[in-house]
Amino acid sequence: MADGLHRVHYNPSTAQLVEFALLRGEGELTANGALVAKTGARSGRSPGDRFIVKEPSSEADIEWGPVNQAFEPGAFEGLWARVEAYLADKELFVSDLEVGADTEHYQPVRVTTQYAWHQLFARNLFIIPEEFNRKDKPVWQIINAPDFVCDPARDGTNSDAAVILNFAERKVLLAGLKYAGEMKKSMFSVQNFLLPAQGVLPMHCSANVGKDGDTTLFFGLSGTGKTTLSADPKRFLIGDDEHGWAPGGVFNIEGGCYAKCIDLSQKNEPVIWDAIRFGTVLENVVMDEHRVPNYKDSSLTENTRAAYPLEHIAQRKEDNCGAEPHAVVFLTCDVSGVLPPVSILTKEQAAYHFLSGYTAKVGSTEIGSTSAIQSTFSTCFGAPFFPRPAGVYAELLMKRIESFGSQVYLVNTGWTGGPHGLGKRFDIPTTRAIVDAIVSGELKDVETIHLDTLNLAVPVAVTGVDSNLLNPINTWGDKALYAEYAQKLAEAFTKNFAKYQVSDAIRHAGPKA
């Protein structure tokens, strides 16, 4: 339906939005039917331009700092009004959507976009409900005005763009940004703030379920394998990035997937490959002269993306929900080549490694990052998206693991035999074999060896995996150099963890520096 007076298109279909995007010059059609859009200089998130309005209802519950930057309520009101005035005579696209597949824990949201392709992205990534807001909850509003230019002196922003969350008014403002991922991560941050108060753990993870109803979760930063490993032809996908874990089950916060495309291949990632078709948005993907996507081309960015609805995946859990997880996998991309490909964690070790969030920025999703791969500690495997203090989420994780009896594993999808540049990265088939062993229950109660410096228990055998790979020292030609790198990594863990106020049992569960 279109409002002729103001040219506002309400709940437009996929076909309509693709047509609008092409007619308005917002993108091009690829040979496989997807819509390619380019985001310009900002081809990733802009963490330096993300703010939360500092107001009485939420102020005491937010961990303020460089991740959660404060914004004054009056400045927000002024900027929101200026953006609304700017959009008043523009053609707009509006949809009523939901975030959260659980019937109790969803949030209704009205998404207004200046671009047709941004609306297509929102309708792909959020949930299109059969009946909007069936519990009549207060509705959130997202306004996305990519062509609006912020003025720091006038608007109180840090640059010409801003992402601002206002919990009191249930508003999200995106101005001056074309990168569509900001929309999904904004509402993820909203749910990350709201869900803990309802006893639900929000998680930066993917999830899938087997034929017997067994759920597995995969935590990890972008590029560590969440989407790839959860898109398993033998299992049913719940979701690839954002979930809630409530007493009794897990649910997808989204209704679609936002898969990295760099070096995508039909052989290694058939589920993702097949999902890219008409209705999919390809972000910053380069095409050849015949409009065939070249997934190896990173000339625009390493952070190329495909945004598609879950309906594009044949093997999926149709209600976007699953039982509580038997297996929880922490995906770490270790650039030092020190960590084993799989470790079996105790509850205390799970809390330690969840708070640490050790991994690497691989093809980083943040603007200004170089193509160099850097190690990082990202609390809860998603520090940029969690407004509350880290301990809130760690306590909820411990509670869920203890009450259900989930087993947690640390899986290294990074390097072995040496650090990045000297060693080699674990290939996808090896990691898939490890994940197969985890989900089958093969690694429960198996014989292990203990790696003293890393303080990790490692299985002595895994079906389909070369046993020499399991203990990382075996893959290094220079054993003394391995010991040196292992000690350096242990020291980095200890230094990073010093900031947390936790029990001795959790503190002593980490590596031994």
From Swiss-Prot:
Keyword Kinase among record annotations: no
Cellular localization per UniProt? Cytoplasm
Example GO molecular function term?
A: metal ion binding
Instruction: Say where the protein is mainly found.
Output: cytoplasm
**Alphabetically ordered keywords of this record:** ATP-binding, Cytoplasm, Decarboxylase, Gluconeogenesis, Lyase, Manganese, Metal-binding, Nucleotide-binding
Described purpose of this protein according to its UniProt entry = Involved in the gluconeogenesis. Catalyzes the conversion of oxaloacetate (OAA) to phosphoenolpyruvate (PEP) through direct phosphoryl transfer between the nucleoside triphosphate and OAA.
Subunit structure and binding partners: Monomer.
Q: What is this protein called?
A: Phosphoenolpyruvate carboxykinase (ATP)
Which gene name belongs to this protein?
A: pckA
